[in-house]
């Protein structure tokens, strides 16, 4: 699943490709992917111009002025822009024909991606209802609320970080990475972390997600940005996907276990339970 660095990289590519472009028509091959009123979706966007492409957590926000199209890539979603003819592909599900003759296509092998049309004035309430936490930046991701959230939870730390309430944008890859960096076992109960562990974890979340954005995200399986390029963050991962390889810090072999139903990579020596 694309996580925050990957989605931000897609956003940057879309910003270059489609901002200030007007929608001429829309074709939807898989109607179930549109989670708001389908007819409203079909008639509201043609004639509108993409003013900005923004991001909140793992959500892409196409700003059309009064309305915003909220897009979630889920497991395999990606956007492609074709300047002329669009090739046949059974995994192309939404087509946004632009007035300049090009077509923005949404591709999704799993068909898990979602689209919603939301009034811009309702966007804050939309994300409040989803209980989406702050962006992982030094300005918005404050230590005190994060520390309090951990102290009040009896959940293991990994599932808690994955649920997006304390901080937005973390997925399986980057949770493994930040927990390794902070030397915290993924099964540790959140309310058992010390203040120093919580402080280090907070700093590493900001540092690693920022690095992920700088490196264009991680291409592990199929991820590419909107320009068709691979990310390079996979070259900087320390534990994710490294089962049986030496820990870069201590040399102990990396192990993989299940935590909350998710495959989880950690160092048994650095991250004691």
From Swiss-Prot:
InterPro entries: DNA_glyclase/AP_lyase_DNA-bd (IPR015886), DNA_glyclase_Znf_dom_DNA_BS (IPR015887), Formamido-pyr_DNA_Glyclase (IPR020629), FPG_cat (IPR012319), MutM-like_N-ter (IPR035937), Ribosomal_uS13-like_H2TH (IPR010979), Znf_DNA_glyclase/AP_lyase (IPR000214), Znf_FPG/IleRS (IPR010663). DNA binds at residues 91, 110. Keywords: DNA damage, DNA repair, DNA-binding, Glycosidase, Hydrolase, Lyase, Metal-binding, Multifunctional enzyme, Zinc, Zinc-finger. GO terms for molecular function: 8-oxo-7,8-dihydroguanine DNA N-glycosylase activity; class I DNA-(apurinic or apyrimidinic site) endonuclease activity; damaged DNA binding; zinc ion binding. The active site is at 2 (schiff-base intermediate with dna), 3 (proton donor), 58 (proton donor), 262 (proton donor). One of its GO terms (biological process) is base-excision repair. The keyword DNA repair applies. A zinc finger (FPG-type) spans 238-272. The keyword Zinc applies. It catalyses: Hydrolysis of DNA containing ring-opened 7-methylguanine residues, releasing 2,6-diamino-4-hydroxy-5-(N-methyl)formamidopyrimidine; 2'-deoxyribonucleotide-(2'-deoxyribose 5'-phosphate)-2'-deoxyribonucleotide-DNA = a 3'-end 2'-deoxyribonucleotide-(2,3-dehydro-2,3-deoxyribose 5'-phosphate)-DNA + a 5'-end 5'-phospho-2'-deoxyribonucleoside-DNA + H(+). Its cofactor is Zn(2+). Binds 1 zinc ion per subunit. Its EC number is 3.2.2.23, 4.2.99.18. Monomer. Belongs to the FPG family. Involved in base excision repair of DNA damaged by oxidation or by mutagenic agents. Acts as a DNA glycosylase that recognizes and removes damaged bases. Has a preference for oxidized purines, such as 7,8-dihydro-8-oxoguanine (8-oxoG). Has AP (apurinic/apyrimidinic) lyase activity and introduces nicks in the DNA strand. Cleaves the DNA backbone by beta-delta elimination to generate a single-strand break at the site of the removed base with both 3'- and 5'-phosphates. PANTHER family: FORMAMIDOPYRIMIDINE-DNA GLYCOSYLASE (PTHR22993:SF9). This is Formamidopyrimidine-DNA glycosylase. It comes from Streptococcus agalactiae serotype V (strain ATCC BAA-611 / 2603 V/R). The lineage of its organism: Bacteria, Bacillati, Bacillota, Bacilli, Lactobacillales.
């Amino acid at each position: 699943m694309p996580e925050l660095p990957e989605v931000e990289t897609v956003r940057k590519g879309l910003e270059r490709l489609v901002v200030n472009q007007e929608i001429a028509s829309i074709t939807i091959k898989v109607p179930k992917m549109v989670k708001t009123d389908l007819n409203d979706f079909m008639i509201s966007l043609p004639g509108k111009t993409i003013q900005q492409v923004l991001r909140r957590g793992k959500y892409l926000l196409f700003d059309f002025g009064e309305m915003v199209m909220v897009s979630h890539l889920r497991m395999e979603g990606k956007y492609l822009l074709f300047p002329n003819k669009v090739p046949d592909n059974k995994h192309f599900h939404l087509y946004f024909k632009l007035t300049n003759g090009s077509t923005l296509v949404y591709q999704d092998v799993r068909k898990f991606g979602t689209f919603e049309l939301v009034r811009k004035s309702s966007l804050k309430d939309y994300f409040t209802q989803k209980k989406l936490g702050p962006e992982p930046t030094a300005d918005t991701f404050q230590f005190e609320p994060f520390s309090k959230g951990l102290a009040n939870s009896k959940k293991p730390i990994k599932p808690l970080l994955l649920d997006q309430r304390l901080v937005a944008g973390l997925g399986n890859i980057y949770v493994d990475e930040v927990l390794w960096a902070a030397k915290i076992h993924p099964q540790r109960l959140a309310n058992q972390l010390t203040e120093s562990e919580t402080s280090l974890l907070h700093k590493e979340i900001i540092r690693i997600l920022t690095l992920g954005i700088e490196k264009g995200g991680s291409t592990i399986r199929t991820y590419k940005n909107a320009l068709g390029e691979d990310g390079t963050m996979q070259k900087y991962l320390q534990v994710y996907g490294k089962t049986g390889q030496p820990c870069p810090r201590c040399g102990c072999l990396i192990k993989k276990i299940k935590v909350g139903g998710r495959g989880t990579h950690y160092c048994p020596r650095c991250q004691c339970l």
